[in-house]
Amino acid sequence: MRYENKALREIVFPLGGIGTGSIGYAGNGRFMDWEIRNRPDKGSANGYTHLAIRCRDRAGRVYARVLQGDYPGSRMGQYDKGEHHGYGFGPAGTTMCGFPHFRSCVFTGSFPFCHIDLADDDFPADVRVTAYNPMIPLDADNSSLPAALFTVAITNTGREAMAFDTAFSLRNLFSGARNGTVRTDTASDALCLAGGAPHDSPAYGEMCLTCAAEDTYCQSHWYRGGWQDPIVTFWNEWSSGERLCDRCYPDPYDGDTGTVVGS
């Protein structure tokens, strides 16, 4: 099935193995419906979890975008969201709709795969994000892995060769959040997120994010601050074109976000 323009609001693709819960990948590339904590949670967001891309031309200009199309929801906001949020305040910041993104967005899906094709006259590449589930016919065990996989295919449409970086930023959604990094057997860095609940508690959880690119590294913690300081600091660092700083905090902090970068 193919979705574009207004039809993008009608599709959310479930990511996750059989019986493991799921995370929704919306038609415009936004992550939503975080139903991986033993309960339904339609419409939920997990902070500023998102995919992003950047490159730099010979003149030094940096092009940075979130890997999303236009936000397809109401520009007025949602009802019953509390003080400073809701109808009349506009879409929630976590939709990333106010960040540089792509004008053209087309979603195609055929389970267990979906594709989002992104293009913009002001960005020197076309991008296809493919997301898929560990669905293997006649192999229930491996099809039940609590995992989702992504590939990012980049087609340079500019007049000069450029190096591209992609980033996956993931918020730790567990109470007593602890972020860390490890080096995998394939020499790739992995971002590990865990909570503070005991292992035998229904509230216990952990997530891991890694990248198979030739050159990878992690920023285990975004800047901790008030208001919108964490996302603003990250975006300033990302859109500068420079390597993200190696920031680390030793103490637990609910809502910490980390990033894995691949080149």
Question: What is each PLM-predicted segment?
Answer:
Residues 1, 8-11, 102-104, 138-141, ...:
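Generic recognition of flexible, low-complexity loop/linker segments
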Residues 1-77:
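Beta-strand-rich N-terminal accessory domains
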Residues 9, 49, 110-112, 146-150, ...:
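Residues that flank catalytic or metal-binding motifs in active/ligand-binding sites
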Residues 10-12, 19-21, 115, 151, ...:
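Beta-sheet entry/capping signal
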Residues 30, 114-118, 157:
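Beta-propeller domains with acidic blade repeats across secreted/periplasmic ectodomains
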Residues 57, 118-122, 156:
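Short acidic, glycine-rich loop/turn motifs
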Residues 76-146, 225-262:
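Extended, loop-rich substrate-binding clefts of extracytoplasmic carbohydrate-active enzymes
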Residues 129, 134-243:
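Polysaccharide-binding surfaces and accessory modules of carbohydrate-active proteins
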